[in-house]
């Protein structure tokens, strides 16, 4: 039986409820009166439930889809303005005991080069990332209790936070590791992590068990209930995601919205972020061998509907996607992107040799961080390296209340400008700096509070003179 307040995976992600939802959506995909009513509800910026959102996903009326896209763009601006948060992944180890059939880290892959970073190598990687201008990392590691125990992850986090190279600093470490215990989540919380991220991969239990035939990840319930344990362990911010292409996308979409509803119902806080990866080629993995791939237009529609269904969430897209796709979905709802990503273990400090490939997936957007920052500004966006909310305690329900009320912009907009100024001073090319200085000058005038505007302008002048790390 479906119960969004239950702590049992098969009750808050209930297969029967999802199938009934998809049937309801099919029956109403041409019901324009109902569709208009749902779109009108979405205009209130309070979100949609999984049934309402699924009806819009099934809708094929071009006029209504255009309305959905326009609304998604406006809602994104209302909650997040024109800011795009920048981050980079850091792969610590590709040792893994699981048998996931879509991931080259699977245990049976005998020709991938296995690698685990030492603390000295972590330091070298972080310095390389700082020298690009990154302030926010998402650390990744395969599941292996011998090679990658929680103690190793904690040591890496400590090392990352300890490094201050020139004007560089990693100010927020997000963590994407396998489902674990409440005790271990408490340790991650104490280590000062930002968001705990865990992709569900697929919400279809039967498919999940087939795609994860061996290893601890085979346990669907343990994996699906991980976010509840993380929040019980004191982690305020969690990030959801599915790997689109493994199962029917409409099933996955309904499950994703249901998971967000569950977190809100039980913990009073929905997902801090939702990621939208699509399966990509990697080592011995061919995405064409999976039958549920989605085209770019369907992908864009999913992104738009996540934005209007869960309006407060940060939406993340990686360099799995091309420049063209990223440009489209940023407009429709994405608020965080990676730049200059390396999906290998190591690779930032020294590019790896071809015969030592350790990548989890192939990258589609190979531009430098400077090129990505320049491109975003040319589109009218503000690249943000801000980590202030995490460092000022604006996490969990406190962040959500500020975000839902729109008050978060009073902090985020000036913080974005100040961190962009840092980037321009320390890392940008001459062309990027010229574009950025003009953008900051223009955006300063948009800060509505005169006192905040003056303080921001003062801090930007101080950054010009060598000071760093101001925040509201």
Where are these regions (language model features)?
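Radical SAM enzyme core and accessory elements
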Residues: 1-37, 324-332, 341-472
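An N-cap/entry alpha-helix motif that binds or orients negatively charged groups
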Residues: 36, 40, 44-84
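Canonical Radical SAM [4Fe-4S] cluster-binding loop centered on the CxxxCxxC motif
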Residues: 80-121
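Generic structural signal for well-ordered alpha-helices
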Residues: 88, 126, 154-161, 185, ...
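Core AdoMet radical
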Residues: 107-124, 128-231, 236-246, 268-275, ...
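Conserved C-terminal portion of the radical SAM core fold
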Residues: 141, 195, 221-285, 295-324, ...
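Short glycine-enriched, charge-decorated loop/helix-capping segments at active-site entrances
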Residues: 211-217, 288-292, 358
């Amino acid at each position: 039986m479906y119960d969004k307040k239950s702590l049992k995976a098969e009750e808050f992600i209930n297969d029967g409820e999802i199938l009934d939802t998809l049937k309801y959506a099919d029956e109403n995909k041409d019901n324009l009166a109902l569709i208009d009513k749902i779109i009108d509800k979405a205009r209130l910026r309070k979100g949609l439930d999984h049934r309402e959102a699924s009806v819009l996903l099934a809708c094929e009326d071009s006029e209504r889809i255009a309305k959905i896209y326009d609304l998604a763009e406006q809602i994104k601006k209302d909650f997040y303005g024109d800011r795009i948060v920048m981050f980079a992944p850091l792969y610590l180890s590709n040792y893994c005991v699981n048998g996931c059939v879509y991931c080259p880290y699977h245990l049976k892959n005998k020709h991938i080069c296995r690698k685990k970073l030492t603390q000295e190598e972590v330091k070298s990687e972080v310095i390389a990332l700082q020298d690009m201008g990154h302030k926010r990392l998402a650390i990744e590691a395969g599941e292996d209790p011998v090679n990658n125990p929680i103690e190793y992850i904690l040591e890496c986090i400590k090392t990352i936070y300890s490094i201050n190279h020139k004007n560089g600093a990693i100010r927020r470490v997000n963590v994407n590791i396998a489902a674990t215990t409440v005790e271990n989540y408490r340790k991650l919380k104490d280590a000062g992590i930002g968001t705990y991220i865990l992709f569900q991969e697929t919400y279809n239990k039967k498919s999940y068990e087939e795609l994860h035939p061996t290893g601890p990840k085979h346990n669907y319930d343990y994996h699906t209930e991980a976010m509840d344990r993380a929040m019980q362990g004191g982690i305020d911010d969690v990030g959801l995601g599915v790997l689109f292409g493994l199962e029917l996308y409409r099933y996955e979409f309904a499950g994703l919205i249901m998971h967000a509803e569950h977190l809100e119902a039980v913990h009073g806080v929905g997902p801090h972020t939702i990621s939208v990866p699509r399966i990509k080629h990697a080592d011995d993995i061919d995405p064409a061998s999976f039958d549920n791939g989605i085209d770019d237009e369907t992908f864009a529609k999913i992104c738009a509907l996540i934005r209007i269904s869960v309006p407060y969430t940060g939406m993340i897209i990686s360099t799995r996607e091309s420049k063209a796709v990223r440009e489209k979905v940023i407009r429709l709802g994405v608020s965080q992107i990676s730049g200059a990503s390396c999906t290998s273990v190591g690779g930032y400090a020294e590019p790896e040799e071809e015969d030592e490939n350790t990548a989890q997936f192939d990258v589609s957007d190979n531009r430098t961080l400077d090129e990505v920052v320049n491109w975003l500004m040319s589109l009218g966006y503000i690249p943000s390296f801000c980590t202030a909310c995490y460092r000022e305690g604006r996490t969990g329900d406190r962040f959500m209340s500020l975000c839902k009320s729109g008050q978060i912009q009073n902090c985020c907009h000036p913080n974005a400008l100040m961190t962009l100024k840092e980037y321009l001073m320390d890392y940008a090319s001459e062309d990027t700096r010229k574009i950025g200085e003009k953008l900051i000058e223009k955006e300063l005038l948009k800060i509505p509070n005169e006192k905040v505007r003056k303080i921001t302008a003062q801090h930007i002048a101080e950054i010009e003179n060598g000071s760093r790390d101001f925040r509201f």
